Amino acid sequence: MRLREIFARDAAERDRAGGKPLEQLALLKESGLLNLLIPTEFGGAGERWSTALKIAREFAKVDGALGHLYGYHFGSQHAAHLRGTAEQAADIFRRSAAGNWFWGNTANSFSKSLFGRRDADGFVLDGFRPFTSGSHIADYLQVAWEDRDTNARSFAAIPANRDGIRIENDWDASASAKPEAGASPTPGSGFIETRYSTTSLTAGVPIRP
């Protein structure tokens, strides 16, 4: 694989130096691999999950962080298909393919630290979510939060540059990169009065295969 060989050339140096893998992300976007699993009718390649996972493993052989990011991208990209309506999934797929979006997530199910409340226009979130893979270089995010009163969990798909979102560079567990420099694939994300309309919700129907 051409990209695997390119990533291998300086993986160790990049790991030591830290920083966001923006050049590598640009290569992924140019290759079309970010849209690999989006159905062809929505502008993607329509490939199988087994193909995407094979590619993620190949990347991980030479660069663990990039393999991590590439694999997690697809889970967030397909969240609307799993949890939303068919119409929501189609809309997300079309816009993601057209924009060549890279996806991150802030949906760590083990953390009860991000809460939402309803207002006239939708929801307002406050709190923090650790282990938010890919959020530091993402175009779009899958977000999950709990209701303070009911503990009910909600999901949404929103732009990563939404006002009120602050991406931290604080992951320090896997020893895969220098977290203080932003190279870690799993930083935390803070939300301060971050607003979401009800149209961005991607939950409320049974999970679909």
Task: Provide a role label for each language-model segment.
Residues G84-T85, A120, E146-D149, A160-R162, ...:
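Short loop segments at secondary-structure junctions
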